[in-house]
Amino acid sequence: LRGKEDAANNYARGHYTVGKELIEVCADRIRKLADQCEGLQGFLVFHSVGGGTGSGFGSLLLQRLALEYGGKKSKLDFCVYPSPQVSTSVVEPYNSVLSTHSLLEHTDVSFMLDNEAIYNICKKSLDIEKPTYTNLNRLIAQVISSLTSSLRFPGPLNLDINDIQTNLVPFPRLHFVLCSYAPVISKEKSEHENITVDAITNSVFSENNIMAKCQPHLGKYMACCLMYRGNIVPKEAQKAVQNIRNEKSKTVSFVDWSPTGFKCGINNSKPTTVLGENGDNMARTEKSVCMLSNTTAISQVFSRINHKFDLMYIKRAFVHWYVGEGMEEGEGL
């Protein structure tokens, strides 16, 4: 599917003007693909919320999926939020706030990512001096691969999409989730490092491994899902979780109405990485863990964007571009 013009970093253009021309064709293609599936569980949607197409057309598509499939099929959304330091557009805060409103209403789980956090992981853990988008995408791919491995391979404690949703979302609107992955280790370091279940479980709770810029120790966890892959015995995973409860009780604290907190999934297939071609430096390991956590610390991401939004909107800066594409000033803005 392709169009003849872009959304020019404008949510209203992606949602109302250009989006309206493409949504019918897009919905029809999705319908045809869905008809070919034997047991459709849901949809994975990938987009950014800072630009015009990802925020505007992404929101329109999610609304359409909600309309056509209702609550019967899960909608899991991977959204790249603007970074604190790395900005690609002046109007990112407008697009992000408008898009978030739609994500609140029309997705079941939203996994929040930001480029700056993933850049830092590539630099610090993989020793890549100038990470490219390919490097970033390969790292995000590890999270998505861990998330879907239970659907694709057998394992002693498999989790499907519905399990993830049930265990991570305590209230319908509190469905924004942080992702973290370990081990992220370069080929050179992997040769002389002992990768244990305890070590990788500790790593995913480190601020340096979380794929969105925030400080989790300042928030409280509502739910936490640990998805292990590879050569892992259930007893080892349970022991590692118990250690987190005991040793990190000050930094990993749960809300009082969710005392159990942890859900574990174990899959026997080893993690795979794409080696070589683009200067990728990620080592293949025997075991890995992906953590999905619903924590109040995610409010830090929203506060940052809200602050930037308010600074511009108080002066009505750039608002005319949105009104010119068919939005009303009171509508979201």
Curated annotation (Swiss-Prot):
Taken from the UniProt entry, a GO cellular component term is: cytoplasm
What main location does UniProt list? cytoplasm
SUPFAM superfamilies attached to this UniProt entry: Tubulin C-terminal domain-like (SSF55307), Tubulin nucleotide-binding domain-like (SSF52490)
Q: Where is the protein localized?
A: Cytoplasm, Cytoskeleton
**Gene3D superfamilies, sorted:** Helix hairpin bin (1.10.287.600), Tubulin/FtsZ, C-terminal domain (3.30.1330.20), Tubulin/FtsZ, GTPase domain (3.40.50.1440)
Alphabetically ordered keywords of this record: Cytoplasm, Cytoskeleton, GTP-binding, Hydrolase, Microtubule, Nucleotide-binding
Tell me the residue numbers annotated for binding GTP: S48, G52, T53, T88, N115, N137
Q: How is it modified after translation?
A: Undergoes a tyrosination/detyrosination cycle, the cyclic removal and re-addition of a C-terminal tyrosine residue by the enzymes tubulin tyrosine carboxypeptidase (TTCP) and tubulin tyrosine ligase (TTL), respectively.
Q: Which residues cross the membrane?
A: none
> Known InterPro entries for this protein?
Alpha_tubulin, Tub_FtsZ_C, Tubulin, Tubulin/FtsZ-like_C, Tubulin/FtsZ_2-layer-sand-dom, Tubulin/FtsZ_GTPase_sf, Tubulin_C, Tubulin_CS
Q: One Pfam family from the UniProt entry?
A: Tubulin_C
Cofactor(s) the record lists:
Mg(2+)
Q: What class of enzyme is it?
A: hydrolase
Q: Share an example GO biological-process annotation for this protein.
A: microtubule-based process
Q: Tell me the GO molecular function terms.
A: GTP binding; hydrolase activity; structural constituent of cytoskeleton
State its Enzyme Commission number(s).
Answer: 3.6.5.-
* Entries under PROSITE patterns matching the protein: TUBULIN
Reactions this protein catalyses: GTP + H2O = GDP + phosphate + H(+)
What the protein does comes down to: Tubulin is the major constituent of microtubules, a cylinder consisting of laterally associated linear protofilaments composed of alpha- and beta-tubulin heterodimers. Microtubules grow by the addition of GTP-tubulin dimers to the microtubule end, where a stabilizing cap forms. Below the cap, tubulin dimers are in GDP-bound state, owing to GTPase activity of alpha-tubulin.
Quaternary structure note: Dimer of alpha and beta chains. A typical microtubule is a hollow water-filled tube with an outer diameter of 25 nm and an inner diameter of 15 nM. Alpha-beta heterodimers associate head-to-tail to form protofilaments running lengthwise along the microtubule wall with the beta-tubulin subunit facing the microtubule plus end conferring a structural polarity. Microtubules usually have 13 protofilaments but different protofilament numbers can be found in some organisms and specialized cells.
- Protein family (similarity comment): Belongs to the tubulin family.
List the protein's name: Tubulin alpha chain
Which organism is this protein's natural source? Dictyostelium purpureum
This chain is encoded by the gene named tuba
